[in-house]
Amino acid sequence: MSGGVRVEKSGPVTTVIMNRPEARNAVNGPAAAGLYAAFDEFDKDDSAAVAVLWGDNGTFCAGADLKAIGTPDSNPVHRTGPGPMGPSRMVLSKPVIAAVSGYAVAGGLELAIWCDMRVVEEDAVMGVFCRRWGVPLIDGGTVRLPRLVGHSRAMDMILTGRGVDSAEAYAMGLANRVVPKGEARQRAEELAAELAALPQQCMRSDRLSTLHQWGLPEADAMDFELSLIHI
């Protein structure tokens, strides 16, 4: 892969790695394209069951690379196609786990909450830091965050732009696991291997139904749930 993105595979687990240390893994246009391509390839790979998204060099992702604005490497912003951060509009058929170390802020937070689960290091910080610079959330932050943590907690984070530590993130449901510093990738890959060992068709159907039910009347959501089962 290119654009500061690389992919490593271990059996059924695919790890997608953001590697732009000079920008704290902030995502520019080429990095967004690299992330999109990596997850597109993962979803099409029959040998891959679960993915992990991790930021190298001690930081998950500092958001979009604001220094790229106005240059050929700026993030594309369109209402259709890939999201500005890359995969944020993709609905994959298989789970993705975010392995969060350091900072997952602004667009980096949006990437983390695009994932199905989040394994967060004890000293990590998550937040809508783009509030400080007058930059809006455009990769699903205003949609997914309230679904994860509730309207009131999401509004607190979105309006204030304050940082949330791992303990608070776990208490509000933003973090699924809290692990020692330096262990996010390893622990996320171990969790991914556990998921990969489970019967896949049933797990993927239940995951899809859980994603699809938002906004549907209960009866329609339950009908869709049943429609995924081969009777």
Model-derived regions, located:
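Short, active-site-adjacent cap segments at secondary-structure transitions
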Residues: 58-62, 67, 105, 127
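Acidic, divalent-metal-coordinating active-site segment for phosphoryl/phosphodiester hydrolysis
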Residues: 162-168
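Conserved small/polar residues in nucleotide/adenosyl-binding loops
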Residues: 230-231
